[in-house]
């Protein structure tokens, strides 16, 4: 693929993720949009890593590191959402203020 196509795809994924993160009222949807943003960043990392020096795997290794951190973030985020849903019976962001108990 050409560099412009990959960058356009990455920018498109990033903008969809930002839009979804800003407009989302559901916590699970917000977590999914955050994962979409991280995947767009990973696509850029791998693309530029192969563009500048395809023999070194710095971008690929950093991308695997970001994927690992994103998996941990998703697990912790879903555990928090599950706990909030158990206590509040809702996963809406505006109803999740736990300080108003």
Swiss-Prot record:
Subcellular location field: Plastid, Chloroplast thylakoid membrane
EC number: 7.1.1.-
Membrane-topology descriptor: Multi-pass membrane protein
GO annotation, cellular component aspect: chloroplast thylakoid membrane; NADH dehydrogenase complex
Listed transmembrane segments: 2-22, 32-52, 61-81
Main location: plastid
Signal peptide start-end: none
Top-rank EC class of the record's enzyme: translocase
Catalytic reaction(s) noted: a plastoquinone + NADH + (n+1) H(+)(in) = a plastoquinol + NAD(+) + n H(+)(out); a plastoquinone + NADPH + (n+1) H(+)(in) = a plastoquinol + NADP(+) + n H(+)(out)
GO BP annotation list: ATP synthesis coupled electron transport; photosynthesis, light reaction
Keywords: Chloroplast, Membrane, NAD, NADP, Plastid, Plastoquinone, Quinone, Thylakoid, Translocase, Transmembrane, Transmembrane helix, Transport
GO molecular function: oxidoreductase activity, acting on NAD(P)H, quinone or similar compound as acceptor; quinone binding
InterPro entries for this protein: NADH_UbQ_OxRdtase_chain4L/K, NUOK/Mnh_C1-like
Sequence similarity: Belongs to the complex I subunit 4L family.
Assembly and binders: NDH is composed of at least 16 different subunits, 5 of which are encoded in the nucleus.
Functional description taken from the UniProt entry: NDH shuttles electrons from NAD(P)H:plastoquinone, via FMN and iron-sulfur (Fe-S) centers, to quinones in the photosynthetic chain and possibly in a chloroplast respiratory chain. The immediate electron acceptor for the enzyme in this species is believed to be plastoquinone. Couples the redox reaction to proton translocation, and thus conserves the redox energy in a proton gradient.
PANTHER family registered for this protein in UniProt: NADH-UBIQUINONE OXIDOREDUCTASE CHAIN 4L, NADH-UBIQUINONE OXIDOREDUCTASE SUBUNIT ND4L
Name by which UniProt lists this protein: NAD(P)H-quinone oxidoreductase subunit 4L, chloroplastic
């Amino acid at each position: 693929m050409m560099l412009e196509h990959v960058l356009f795809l990455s920018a498109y994924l990033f903008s969809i993720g930002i839009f979804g993160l800003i407009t989302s009222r559901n916590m699970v949807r917000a977590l999914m949009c955050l994962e979409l943003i991280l995947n767009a960043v990973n696509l850029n990392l791998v693309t530029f890593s192969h563009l500048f020096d395809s023999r070194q795997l710095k971008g690929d290794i950093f991308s695997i590191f970001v994927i690992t951190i994103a998996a941990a973030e998703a697990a912790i985020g879903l555990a928090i959402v599950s706990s909030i849903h158990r206590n509040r019976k809702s996963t809406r962001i505006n109803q999740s203020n736990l300080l108003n108990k």
